[in-house]
């Protein structure tokens, strides 16, 4: 199973998510749980479409780090 890093951002009305390694792979949801489900589905569909078009599937390369600042 391949794991891609996902960035989730909260806005006043919903959550947005995007995948740094998959250009254009984005999703939204009203709750954190909903956006997680939606981005997982978006990744699956994105990869299927890339395969159908004969595109190279990128290996995950983005890394996540939490940086503390004063």
Regions found by a protein language model. Name each.
Residues 12, 23, 62-63:
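Short, flexible active-site-adjacent loop segments at beta-strand->alpha-helix junctions, enriched
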Residues 7-19:
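Short aromatic-glycine-(Arg/Gly/Cys) micro-motifs in beta-strand/loop hairpins
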Residues 23-32:
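A short, exposed loop/beta-hairpin motif centered on an aromatic-Gly-Thr core
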